[in-house]
């Protein structure tokens, strides 16, 4: 496989996350992903504007869509909100533009937590807007046979972290489920060039799962 590199460093795009405090907007990348890039000798290229997506997608080998503290507006999967949340459409629109560009070039995409949810909604899936017992905890997940995760973990159950209150309800038709929790919440999805994980391997310092999927 041929990589886009500078020296020996592979270029991987990452969608910045949006935070608004006291009316001030800030786009940022968490330290967890900075440490991941350092460990794998990757260079992360932040995406902070939809205007930059096409150029960055042509330059980079793969895309990471991280988790977010912001929920996706249910209007994007044709449902009404059950909460009176303030939704920041700008962040999801950035994810959409990035997914479209990288998917259109058959490049690898990994979505983490809310990033997996963005992938599912983009391709026509829906979400549970609120679930119990999955925020700030650890729990086991069951790995589905004949998936990327089964080849990576080589075991039937794995204990993972959990920091979410939304989850996939109807999975988009182009994905298969690759892991579920004991209460039947979808914990991972995949297709040929896309991997979605509801948990946070970067927090657990499981950097190899990124390397194995993106560089395989």
Q: What positions do the PLM features span?
A:
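Short catalytic/ligand-gating loop segments at beta-alpha or beta-beta junctions
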Residues: 159-165, 189
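Active-site-proximal beta-strand elements of phosphoester/diester hydrolases
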Residues: 195-200
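Beta-strand-turn-beta hairpins that frame and shape the catalytic cleft
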Residues: 174, 191-194
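N-terminal beta1-alpha1 cap of cysteine-dependent amidohydrolase-like domains
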Residues: 1-114, 122, 128, 132-153, ...
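Short, surface-exposed beta-strand/loop micro-motifs that present aromatic residues
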Residues: 185-191
């Amino acid at each position: 496989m041929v990589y886009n590199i500078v020296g020996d460093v592979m270029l991987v795009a990452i969608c910045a996350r949006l935070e608004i405090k006291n009316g001030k907007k800030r786009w940022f990348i968490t330290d967890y992903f900075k440490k991941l890039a350092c460990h794998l000798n990757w260079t992360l290229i932040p995406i902070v504007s939809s205007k930059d997506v096409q150029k960055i997608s042509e330059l980079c080998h793969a895309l990471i869509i991280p988790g977010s503290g912001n929920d996706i507006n249910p209007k994007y999967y044709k449902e009404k909100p059950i909460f009176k949340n303030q939704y920041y459409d700008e962040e999801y629109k950035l994810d959409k533009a990035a997914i479209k560009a990288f998917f259109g070039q058959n490049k690898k995409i990994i979505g983490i937590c809310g990033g997996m949810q963005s992938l599912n909604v983009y391709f026509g899936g829906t979400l549970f807007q609120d679930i119990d017992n999955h925020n700030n905890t650890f729990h086991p997940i069951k790995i589905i046979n004949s998936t990327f995760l089964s080849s990576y973990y080589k075991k039937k159950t794995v204990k993972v972290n959990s920091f979410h209150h939304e989850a996939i309800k109807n999975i988009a038709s182009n994905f298969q489920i690759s892991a579920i929790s004991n209460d039947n919440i979808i914990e991972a999805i995949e297709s040929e060039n896309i991997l979605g994980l509801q948990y946070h391997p970067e927090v657990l310092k499981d950097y190899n799962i990124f390397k194995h999927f993106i560089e395989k």
